[in-house]
Each structure stands twice: as structure tokens, then as C-alpha cells.
């Protein structure tokens, strides 16, 4: 359809969920393992290496009490999955979300291993976080929760061992609290200058310029490279984005500089449509002030189903996993899907996209800009250096385009989808290390 129906749901109706309702329980970890198995058949991975990579090296679960503002104490549950460190220190974000689970973190931790290997970074994969809604607590409570969590992890993280970063529900401020906690506890005992214990910090506290926009910038580099190879002019094209946090908002702003217009947007509160295109800078500012797109005046409320049927050219899912199943993929009216989030397309949805000829830029590549610039931050911390924005952006663009080329070359050689090609490239690097080092003892 060219535009959403004029029939709107009443304002008092429940806000549509961003979760796909077609699948009762989505086994994200099993899905990631299926991608590994498919790529492994193309790369001829030794059985013992495949067995090792199917499961994380360490699974950490911590319970810790926090005093809330009302004086009561609440027990929280935190996780850290350390999937692989065969290439270097564990690396991956910390997610605060009410639906966080061990299996999801296992899937996301494994994905970080493939992502770092694809990007030729000297990191392994990890993921973690806390099962709670960060929007439900005060700033002071959030600080205490973060500090107690990182204190509970103790020496299970460190600049040479496991380096966390922001993810869903966390940001630069979260990382500043985490770093300060580590420096005043484990760092004091080890007598080390450990500013690089986390990345994604505020620039004033050891972060790097370009990190805040890095994931969105990486998505845009991939979209621009796809457009160049496809002889597809971005100027005047239309974009829809699901999720308008760090990744979604920065992707929309950066694509606007290429002449791409955002015509539909959604988040956890609902969906909005503007056929003339949103002012992405104003929308981003509104969300920063209000926490969501809810109440934004310059857009028409639409349903979730209408959002996926909006006529556009590019779709960037930048919310959570399992958002694009078969029904959503059938409804999409775009030429390209670029995964800003991790695992937004289910295997069933991806199969429909392939059948309909809609190109897919997979998460393992498309959103790897974040961890790539996190690596640059880590290097600067270790060397006591400060890089300018030009150096960071030039390095990031080259890294993204090099990885894009590795993906397309593998896909062409093996006749496989882009996602499996990314896993294949990553596996080639990992397998070689296992063959070189062999298995202890």
C-alpha cells in the first residue's frame, strides 16, 4: 500500500507491542546455532571446534541487593555470558531489560564472537545485563543498581579479560558508573589504571569521539555501499525505522544527510507516520527529552500492521530480536532491510524476504560499527592517546567497507545468503586459530 489506512485506533486502545505475536516463545539461541551449523558446513569446521563454539565458555549469574529510594531492599538478577576469548578479551554489551534471559544472552554473546571475528578485531564475544525495566527506577536507584552489579562481577571483568559496553537500556552514563566502581574496587587491589575496563564511556571520562553515533554510522556505511554497488540513488528515497533509541535515531539522522526521508517510525510505545517526512533532528531531541515517541505531534498514529506496510525504500529494524517474522516480511514494501538491532529478523521472516527479492544486510555486519569504535576507544585508553573525529570516522568507514567486501566475496564464492557469509568469514578466522593453538592439554 502507498500509505496507511485513514482508520485509526482510538487513543485509549492499548499501545501496540513491538514484540512479534506470531511466535509464543522464540528460541534465539537455537536460531544462532542454526546459522553457525549452516556456515560450518561451507567452511568444513572440525567437529571439535563446532562443539566448542556452540556453547559459551563461562555463564555467570549474580544476585545482589539494592536499597531503593523508599528504604526497601530489592534483589536483582544479573548475567554475564562469556562466549569465546580465543581471539582476545571477551567483548560485548550490558543490557537492562525486563525480558532479559540467560538464553538470549547466550545467543547475543555468540553473535559478538562472530561480529568481532568478521571485523578482524582482537576480541572475543560476550553479553550480559540485568533483568529489570530501567525506566521503572529513579536515576539514583539506577546508579546503585549498576554499581552493585559491577561490584558483584568483580574480577570477572577487566581491560585484559572482559570489556563491557552499552546496549539496550544502558548508555554512556551507565558505563561511567561501571568504570568508577571497578577503579575503586578491583582496580585499587590490582593497582592498575583500568580506564579501558568498559567502552562507550562519556568522552570526558575516557570515551572516544564518534562512539555515540558509531553503530548508526556503521549501518549507514553498509547502506551506502549497498546503494553504490546496486546503482541505487539514495537522494529522495524513503525510510522506515523500528526503534528510535541510539541506533535508530542516529541512523535516521545520518541518512537524512544523504537525502533519505524518514516517513514512519516506531518504538515500545507505538508507531507514527508522516508522508512528508519527519524532521529527524527534532524527533531525536523530543525522544531524548521524553523517553519515547509517544505524544510527538508531527506524526499520525498508526498500528503495528500499518507500519510494516508503509511504502518506502529502506527498513532499519533497530529495536529487539524477533520483530520481523513471516507476516511482517510479507507486508514490507521496501527494497532493503538493514539490521540495526541484533536478530530482528526470524529465519521465517528472512526466508520471505529472500523469496520476495528484498535485500538483507545482516546484523553481524550492519551494526558492527559500535564494537569497532569501542575497540578504538579501548586502544586509546591503553595507549593514553586521544584521536580526533576524522581519524575515528576514517578508520570506521574502512573497517566497515572491508568487512562488507569479505561478506560479498564469500557469498559469491559459496552461493549463500549474506548472513551465512558473515558467519562463514568469521568461522574461517576462528578455525585457523584453533588449528594453530590446538586444544590444551
Residue spans for each PLM region:
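Rossmann-like adenosine-cofactor binding region
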Residues: 270-360
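Glycine-rich phosphate/diphosphate-binding loop of Rossmann-like nucleotide-binding domains
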Residues: 199-311
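Flexible, glycine/charged-enriched surface loops at secondary-structure junctions
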Residues: 46-52, 120, 158-166, 191-194, ...
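Glycine-rich, N-terminal phosphate-binding loop and its surrounding beta-alpha-beta segment
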Residues: 62-134
